[in-house]
Curated annotation (Swiss-Prot):
A single GO molecular function term of this UniProt record: metal ion binding
Free-text function comment from the UniProt entry: Essential role in cell cycle control. PP2A may be involved in controlling the entry into mitosis, possibly acting as an inhibitor.
SUPFAM superfamilies, sorted: Metallo-dependent phosphatases
Positions annotated to bind Mn(2+) 2: D85, N117, H167, H241
One Pfam family here: Metallophos
Protein name per Swiss-Prot or TrEMBL: Minor serine/threonine-protein phosphatase PP2A-1 catalytic subunit
Cofactor mode of binding and number, as noted: Binds 2 manganese ions per subunit.
Residue(s) carrying Leucine methyl ester: L309
Taxonomic source organism: Schizosaccharomyces pombe (strain 972 / ATCC 24843)
Record bears the keyword Plastid: no
Length: 309
């Protein structure tokens, strides 16, 4: 199936999804097949050029994704790099992940979508995406197509050989970017090992490696990040994965930044969101924003499931 012969169809999908209307099951099947073609040729360390806008977790908050495009600029006018966690917890995971995948098919050089720890079969069965697919499609087929596609998402990206981007964090199994490049990523997120760590680990103020309270991945100290950046010629690690109240947060010695792009997370956390714009000269600036106003969902907070945050 060739992407070039399907441009008109992909444009129709984008138009429909931009109205927060889910695609038919048949369209989802076709879209996932096309996306596999595009993603399968990308590297585990996908090379990205400036200018680009870097984004963190979205978690099915579709209207806030629309606000992100409103603030950062529409695709494909702005180049985007999303660092995972498109699904679960929000009410519109199907529409959110579908739109980002459709953009990826239509503008493969303009948008990069990485894998987060929620782009997994096991996690989505617990935190909402599986149930949402059942509710919207009446069966689990669409969930199956999406989660099969998630196996193809790149694990990390490298902006101008200087800024390393990934969902979670570092791994004691990985010293160099070449160690990431040789991983076989086309699989369910494992319970342990380097792929798991890249999607689950968190920076910490304490030096060295630590046991993660999440039960997967590790915590890594400023010394670990400093050594990794030095060994790989990097200026900075940009990652997502953690709720930060102002939308972005630096580690103490400014070598790791966390970016979180789901404002008022779970429709009740009251946090700001942020995106990081990087210009042609690799200067970066953060844009913070609040949740998008939406009249039709004012009742939403009263029926938010009591997820563990």
């Amino acid at each position: 199936m060739s992407v070039s012969g399907k441009i008109g169809e992909v444009d129709r999908w984008i138009e429909q999804l931009s109205r927060c209307e889910p695609l038919s099951e048949e369209d989802v099947i076709q879209m996932c097949d096309l996306a596999k073609e595009v993603l399968s040729v990308e590297s585990n360390v996908q090379s990205v050029r400036c200018p680009v806008t870097v984004c963190g977790d979205i978690h099915g908050q579709f209207h806030d994704l629309m606000e992100l495009f409103n603030i950062g600029g529409p695709s494909p006018d702005t180049n985007y790099l999303f660092m995972g966690d498109y699904v679960d917890r929000g009410y519109h995971s199907v529409e959110t992940v579908s739109l980002l995948i459709a953009f990826k098919i239509r503008y493969p050089q303009r948008i990069t979508i990485l894998r987060g720890n929620h782009e997994s079969r096991q996690i989505t069965q617990v935190y909402g995406f599986y149930d949402e697919c059942l509710r919207k499609y009446g069966n689990a087929n669409v969930w199956q197509y999406f989660t099969d596609l998630f196996d193809y998402l790149p694990l990390t990206a490298l902006i101008e050989d200087r800024i390393f981007c990934l969902h979670g964090g570092l791994s004691p199994s990985i010293d160099t970017l070449d160690h990431v490049r040789i991983l076989d990523r086309v699989q369910e997120v494992p319970h342990e090992g380097p792929i798991c760590d890249l999607l689950w680990s968190d920076p910490d103020d304490r030096p060295g490696w630590g046991i993660s309270p999440r039960g997967a991945g590790y915590t890594f100290g400023p010394d670990i990040a400093e050594a990794f950046n030095h060994n790989n010629g990097l200026d900075l690690i940009a990652r997502a994965h953690q709720l930060v109240m102002e939308g972005y947060n630096w580690t103490t010695n400014h070598n790791v930044v966390t970016i979180f792009s789901a404002p008022n997370y779970c429709y009740r956390c009251g946090n700001q969101a942020a995106i990081m714009g990087i210009d042609d000269h690799i200067n970066y600036a953060f844009i913070q924003y609040d949740t998008a106003p939406r009249k039709e969902e004012l009742h939403v907070t009263r029926r938010t499931p009591d997820y563990f945050l």
